[in-house]
Amino acid sequence: VPMPMSVEARTPVVVGVGDVTHRGDDFVDPIDLAVEAARRAVKDAGRAVERRIDTVATPGILVIPRDNPASRIAEAMRISPARRISCPVGGNTPQYLVEVLGGEIGEGRADVVLVVGAESGHSARKLQGRALLDSPPPPRSSDESLGDARPGLSQAELSVGLSWPHEVYPIFESAIAARHGRDFDAQREWLGTLMAPFTAEAARHPQQAWFPRSRSATELSEVTAENRMVCLPYPKLLNSIMSVDMAAAFILMAAEVADELGVARDRWVFPWSAATCNDVYFPVERPDLSRSSGIEVAARKALNAGRLTIDDIRWFDLYSCFPSAIEMAAEALDLDPLDDRGLTVTGGLPYHGGPGNNYVSHSIVEMVRRCRRDPTDVGLVTGLGWYSTKHSVGLWSATPPPTGWRLLDTAVEQAQIDSSRLGVAGVDEATGCATVDGYTVVYDRDGQPRWTPIIAHLYDGRRVVARSDDPQIAEAMGAEMYVGKTVCLRDTGSFTGFELP
């Protein structure tokens, strides 16, 4: 069939998708998992595409890290792509790669791109720190790096011991709760309602989802021995789970190459538009801990490019590492968080499973399958990196993009966002009173409150990060909402502490 006029020759199109969820008792190497997902994507597109792959791009593997993963995957597949790319930390990576490498396809610098990633978090957990099998020999070639490699936290957050996403996202949640006039208990109840539909979606994917079980709002929000409090207001079932053995892959190529290779038209799904924008990079510097301007910019640009509004979108997969990420995305999109279209096509990171930087590859794989089934509909995928820091958004449809493939520049908006960042007081200047902007209480595995990190501002507007290790303060701040209240800072010598007045 000759190409219809509506598809320009260099339009990027996804023609093959594959995923693997490995449930055995054995240990699997992430490279082996990735290769299996890639083979499935090749089979989905038709064997002819394999020898034409000129670029392999791999989101960074976190739990059992492998150096030069793209080169290792290519060698295991016995293909020799000209470019092998691996990426730094960022859950937005797969959608970001669609944008950047789709751009290269559009400009004729790449023809056939394999994006593939994996995590063996479940294997790692079973190994409990023992080395996985044998360390593989080094690959014959090395990867180039693509993406923003800055760390996710500044010295201000690190100085009080904040380091993990599960400690930082609840701080955003407290700011969201306070803005809606809720305390932690009321917020936790609401989050059960928000997340229950995600579990129902996961249950519809028994082959893929790590936890394919539908749960009620109460099951999710009620604190029990099985559902222990992790960091207020998130019990365990509201947290992303990375200890999964999963891989996903998709093949992106120029439309003219897909035609030349005879890829059946019913395989074709187009990225319509793609945009990336960061929030103010470090959480401590963000003027509003309860909102994301980066998602708002990226999503608005992507929708405008497709000449669509949010009402035109049939499916969403909003990045769901923690509930606050979903709430911020829904608000940025002007979307009711309980919209009956649903906010996920997979079940999300807590229930489908959150395989590190590669989760969005699973979103894209499932979105492609839906677009193939309903070719006139459009889906929207968001990906997010670090602490609601880096945002990549894309539109997807089996209908060719009516405006052509659109790469979107967000430089002007990015400069505006960056210029809104707040100053941060040095440790020696963090004295006197401060007003709490966001906080959480971190619990231990026995259900006892352990410590309380806060992000607050001084009378002059500069931000501070402080912590208390007093269990009574933790108890008090868990019982009542402290966002907007005053605390007294004190220098502990090594970090900024605080007390209640």
Residue ranges of model-derived segments:
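Active-site capping/gating regions of soluble enzymes
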Residues: 379-381
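Gly/Pro-rich active-site capping loops and adjacent beta-alpha segments
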Residues: 387-389
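A conserved active-site cap/scaffold subdomain adjacent to cofactor or substrate pockets
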Residues: 352-360, 371, 376
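Conserved "HGTGT" condensation-loop signature of ketosynthase/thiolase-family condensing enzymes
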Residues: 2-88, 102-110, 114-250, 254-257, ...
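Conserved phosphate-binding catalytic cores of ATP/NTP-utilizing and phosphoryl-transfer enzymes
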Residues: 95-103
